Design a protein with these regions (language model features):
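AAA+ P-loop NTPase catalytic core and its hallmark functional loops
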Residues: 1-228
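Conserved core positions of repeat-based scaffolds
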Residues: 228-236
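C-terminal helical "lid" subdomain and adjoining coupling/linker elements of P-loop NTPases
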Residues: 237-251
Length: 251
């Protein structure tokens, strides 16, 4: 199975891989959401983090990926959705995000008021993986609507409509950076509903993997130099000698 092959390559525990296969067999994807299952641009590299995240998701936990810039938080979230063969629902949080954006709002359809389902509602309904990007940028009153969704109740109560229970395969993966403009500490009540994974900084080994995957024809000397430059920038940013702005793998 292509989606799980790279787990075997990284020597992820065979028991975890077996349980992922069982999860995939148990929860089939409905045709209308199949287009949301997208192969990531690159596999996530890091056996320990993968095992921790997969074990948490199999136990029904929601994940909160924290850590400095350029540690692969979004790549990991996308990989997990792909590994579990679940449709991915991305929500990019910002200061103006409100509960209507997440759960849904009223709209007119054929002269009738109906609910336009939000991203979180659809994720809950179809058993997707909700990727909550930069969750610490939203106001607390906006994300508070997620409390019942993320804890043992696993439900969404839509005012004026009905209560829906989450699909048993639905999971939520939040990502957050510290120190970005507009970010803040998350409410303790919200954090307690996640399994928090602190993402480690890039290493020479992980950067070697990324460069070999993304640029297979690059000259070895050039690859070594690029890796060295990034590690130097990362060290200086960690020691607050420079800003974190130049520390980026996207460019």
């Amino acid at each position: 199975m292509e989606e799980l092959k790279f787990l075997e390559e990284q020597q992820v525990a065979s028991e975890l891989i077996k349980r992922v296969e069982e999860f995939r067999s148990q929860y089939e994807v409905v045709p209308e959401t199949a287009g949301r299952i997208v192969k990531p641009s690159i596999p996530f590299y890091g056996k320990d983090i993968l095992e921790m995240a997969i074990a948490g998701l199999l136990k029904g936990e929601n994940l909160l990926l924290t850590g400095p810039k350029a540690t692969g938080k979004n790549i990991l979230a996308e990989n997990l959705a792909y590994i579990f063969n679940r449709p991915a629902y991305n929500v990019s949080f910002h200061v103006n995000t409100n509960s209507g954006d997440l759960i849904g709002t009223d709209t007119f359809v054929d002269n009738e008021v109906k609910l336009r389902k939000g991203t979180i509602y659809q994720c809950a309904e179809y058993g997707g993986f909700g990727i909550l990007d930069e969750i610490n940028m939203a106001k607390n009153d906006a994300v508070s609507v997620l409390h019942a969704t993320l804890d043992y109740r696993r439900s969404i109560d839509v005012p004026g409509y009905d209560k829906i229970d989450l699909h048993p395969a639905a999971r939520f993966i939040g990502t957050m950076n510290y120190g970005y403009a507009g970010t803040k500490e998350l409410n303790e009540a919200l954090v307690s509903r996640f399994l928090v994974i602190d993402m480690p900084a890039q290493t020479e080994e992980s950067l070697e993997f990324i460069f070999r995957r993304m640029f297979p024809n690059i000259k070895e000397n050039a690859r070594t130099q690029f890796i060295g430059v990034f590690l130097d920038l990362q060290l200086k940013a960690t020691n607050s000698e420079i800003s974190t702005k130049p520390l980026d793998l996207r460019g």
